[in-house]
């Protein structure tokens, strides 16, 4: 694989893959099992590079044109400012993918089933490592290979083909996918409170403030930590000051669940 999104030393990526299968139904010990028409065990492993989320020329330092300025009355020159530091060591995101499964046909090919287990480790995900630099650094940051995500799960499909009379044919089936992922590495600040950590949680984790109740009804207004989100009064929601610093702000956000469903189901009728 090749891409001009990287420096000349990293423009090519070796992407090997291998797969194997065993058709169990072809074995002699299966010949007498009339209910099984086809049965196959399969497995594969591959390494795949990604450039879809990578911008062009991130390996080069970029500059902005800020117009002109005059000096010595009649002399003009251009003004430029730093837009982004380039990173010549930036390289491909890639995934290591492993799959193993079994598929079969039964009862004169009327019943078809398939079960697969998948495991993917996505490495060297590209992002801005702003946790390494102070906020006052401005644009003096660069894109780096800083992330890693693990995805794994199973998917199952089952279908039945039948007929009513000679002319009415039908197929009914169901499928299910169970999938979980976890952020293994990212540019997270060292020493951050455990409730704020993104590492170790699903990538679709939603962070938000923890509601304690209503001011005036559940929580005394005058005894609560200062909430930094505008004016509030009795009847408004009181939020938890999780780090106990006397101020409720973004540093008190905690995991509220995730937006991506772990299990999905489907039914088909033809």
Question: Could you tell me what each predicted segment is?
Answer:
Residues 68-112, 141-165, 200-206, 258-263:
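Outer-membrane beta-barrel signature, preferentially recognizing the C-terminal barrel domain
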Residues 144, 150, 161-259:
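Conserved small-residue
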Residues 2-4, 23-27, 80-86, 136-142, ...:
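Extracytoplasmic loops and strand-loop junctions of Gram-negative outer membrane beta-barrel proteins
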Residues 37-43, 100, 111-113, 170-172, ...:
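Transmembrane beta-strands of outer-membrane beta-barrel proteins
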Residues 31-93, 112-149, 193:
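Solvent-exposed loop/turn elements at secondary-structure boundaries
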Residues 19-23, 91, 101-105, 116, ...:
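Transmembrane beta-barrel domains of outer membrane proteins
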Residues 1-4, 24, 45-49, 117-123, ...:
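Transmembrane beta-strands of outer-membrane beta-barrel pores
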Residues 14, 24-28, 35, 49, ...:
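Outer-membrane beta-barrel strand-turn architecture
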